[in-house]
Amino acid sequence: MRRSIATGFASIVKGFHLHSHRHRLQISNPRTAASLSLCGFCFWIRAFSSYRKILRNGLHNLQFNDALDLFTRMVHSRPLPSIIDFTRLLSVIAKMNRYDVVISLFEQMQILGIPPLLCTCNIVMHCVCLSSQPCRASCFLGKMMKLGFEPDLVTFTSLLNGYCHWNRIEDAIALFDQILGMGFKPNVVTYTTLIRCLCKNRHLNHAVELFNQMGTNGSRPNVVTYNALVTGLCEIGRWGDAAWLLRDMMKRRIEPNVITFTALIDAFVKVGKLMEAKELYNVMIQMSVYPDVFTYGSLINGLCMYGLLDEARQMFYLMERNGCYPNEVIYTTLIHGFCKSKRVEDGMKIFYEMSQKGVVANTITYTVLIQGYCLVGRPDVAQEVFNQMSSRRAPPDIRTYNVLLDGLCCNGKVEKALMIFEYMRKREMDINIVTYTIIIQGMCKLGKVEDAFDLFCSLFSKGMKPNVITYTTMISGFCRRGLIHEADSLFKKMKEDGFLPNESVYK
């Protein structure tokens, strides 16, 4: 086995490119530990008893600074603590995601001549893979071999996770094959690591294949494995396969969690299967799986999409009663639902509640309100909301301007829209084709067809291409003025530019 591992390791190292000197972990001569200045025998005794007391009490609730302080006490203790104690501490710091710190502390241990265990090296390998470049992981793998350690499945799974972290999918797949070739039996962590990576990068067929292999290789998937697949399938619209997986995991007595249910609920909402989403929510509650902010957000969004606004509001308040507090996205979703249904005052009530609860409205929230007021024929109030934005740390973006301009034009306030458009041009704002199309339409409504066509022609010099809506708007403007020849010429140019006319061109 050792020989096959060594051969496999050699081929893995060959796959790395950038072996630079600065990336290598230096393992110094243990004798240099003698040069470290210590503070005397009494200090050693105090430090020794102090760190032992902390270790006895457990490291679960240890804060980062306390962990560093504990390491300092441990290295100043005499005799030095066992490598098991050091390994436990490194593991705790690694769980805090302070990977560079773990690597640095390990280097200090090497200087002090504290010989590591294989599990110590595996913790460091995990940290190297999540904080550094591939070449450093290769270097550390070589150091492990020099120290006499034969990398095990945990080592290679960490390296596999590193490849996934660096988005090197082909290398991850190749390493997985090498792991099999070296005689290792991948466990659920190894499989799940690669499956999650494949799903994230939309290689779903390969991920499903790998999932099916697990049973034949004697590795049982867990809820994390299922969640990776369910989420990946839902993201590409394969909700039927995802629902089958949910049934499969329940048959195997693997309990789905909030991530499993939320992925499917969100997928059902997106494909218009609101009833199925609500049924799944009820199953979730019956199984005592508590919804989170994402679950509630998906359901509220679905209810708003179907105009079930009072039910959406009930779900919103139920969420609060259950101790799950809405964020600005959920507030905005509900406000948008009310505004879209012309219930702007109800939307404003939610907006005021949002402010009272200390949730800060963002640019999208204000844009939704502006659109709502324009929709109910109150463009002046919409402009008041617009004017408040900058002072409330939610500066308007191009979409906000477009919504306001469109609302003003649709409500007969074209001159005001033109003034705002002129202001945007003077400020050299990043005006897009939607903005120009709105203004061209507004000009045509005012009878300023020549000005509209001048603006239309200027688009090409600005490096901006009209879309089918821009063409249709301009053609309609010509037709309303009886300029049939000009409309026909523009219609031909539209087809030359590769745009297929829509039904509004023929009206």
From Swiss-Prot:
Superkingdom, taxonomy of origin: Eukaryota
Segment annotated as transit peptide: 1-48
Keyword Repeat appears in the UniProt entry: yes
Gene Ontology cellular-component annotations: mitochondrion
One Pfam family per UniProt: PPR_2
PPR repeat spans: 47-81, 82-116, 117-151, 152-186, 187-221, 222-256, 257-291, 292-326, 327-361, 362-396, 397-431, 432-466, 467-501
InterPro entries in alphabetical order: Pentatricopeptide_rpt (IPR002885), TPR-like_helical_dom_sf (IPR011990)
Keyword vocabulary terms for this entry: Mitochondrion, Repeat, Transit peptide
Cellular compartment(s): Mitochondrion
Principal location listed in the UniProt entry: mitochondrion
UniProt xrefs under Gene3D superfamilies: Tetratricopeptide repeat domain
Coiled coil: none
Similarity comment: Belongs to the PPR family. P subfamily.
Name of this chain's protein: Putative pentatricopeptide repeat-containing protein At3g16710, mitochondrial
